[in-house]
Regions:
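Short, basic/glycine-rich phosphate-binding loops at helix/coil junctions
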Residues: 24-30, 91-92, 163-168
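Conserved beta-strand hairpin/beta-sheet module of binuclear metal-dependent hydrolase folds
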Residues: 2-53, 141-160
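Hydrophobic residues at beta-strand termini and immediately following loops
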Residues: 16, 114, 132
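Conserved S/T- and glycine-rich ATP-binding loop of Class I adenylate-forming
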Residues: 28, 61, 132
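Active-site HxH/HxHxD metal-binding segment of metal-dependent hydrolases
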Residues: 41-125, 145-148, 214-217
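Metallo-beta-lactamase
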Residues: 34, 97-98, 126-220
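Residue-level detector of beta-strand structural context in well-folded domains
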Residues: 24-26, 112, 117-118, 140, ...
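Aromatic/hydrophobic pocket-lining residues that form the small-molecule binding cavity
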Residues: 39, 67-68, 182, 186
Length: 220
């Protein structure tokens, strides 16, 4: 499947759709470093899409199998640093059992365990980590402002995983989910600028401004 380009962002963003749940697998680069977000199911397809580029980091927004299924193979093939939240990392790397609502997947070592408020530098990109429970206990969003991208006139970017979608939010009825926590997470995201481009784990990209009048109004 061909890579699709996300336009008007402050960094280079493109994506593949993988797996039966149609996960968005993002490739993000500032021209120096490259990261892949949520390698869903096919590491070989991701390698072909990289087309020889060095992969610096693999970011896992949460512990569900449709977001981490190819992480172990991709780490083995590239040597890239795997980053997940400190809360969800134990399930990803096999330190704790897979939750009852999660499908079995190949466990993957987590090289860096991020916490809320961390700033993670990948190349010249400096991503702010926002832990946003609700879908899972340790789900996280990553936020980047234009001064740390390679397109200063582009919009800020939010990697939202399964927290925020176009017109909706992630399910909260799985083990570790909580609508109360989801509402609090949405209120945190609502402080971001309207022009922020949202890169969700499934479905079409959106903006914070577009979701302010629908998703935030309904759920937050």
């Amino acid at each position: 499947m061909a890579l699709r380009v996300v336009k008007k962002t402050c960094v280079d963003v493109c994506f593949l759709v993988q797996g039966m749940l149609e996960n968005n697998v993002y490739f993000i680069s500032d021209g120096e470093a490259t990261m892949v977000v949520d390698p869903s199911s096919d590491a070989e397809e991701i390698m072909r899409a990289l087309d020889g580029r060095e992969l610096d980091a693999i970011v896992l927004t949460h512990c569900h199998s449709d977001h981490v299924g190819a992480a172990a193979d991709l780490r083995r093939l590239t040597g890239a640093t795997v980053i997940a939240s400190k809360i969800d990392a134990p399930e990803i790397c096999g330190e704790k059992p897979i939750s009852r609502d999660n499908w079995k997947f190949k466990t993957c070592p987590v090289d860096f365990r991020a916490e809320d408020g961390d700033v993670v530098e990948i190349g010249n990109m400096a991503w702010k980590v926002m832990v946003t429970p609700g879908h899972t206990k340790g789900g996280m969003c990553w936020y980047l402002v234009p001064q740390f991208g390679n397109h200063e006139s582009g919009a800020p970017v939010l990697i939202s995983g399964d927290t925020l979608f176009e017109g909706s939010v992630g399910r909260t009825d799985f083990e570790g989910g909580s609508m109360k926590e989801m509402r609090a997470s949405l209120r945190k995201l609502a402080f971001l600028p309207d022009e922020t481009i949202v890169l969700p784990g499934h479905g079409r990209q959106t903006t914070i401004g577009a979701e302010r009048s629908r998703t935030f109004a309904q759920w937050a």
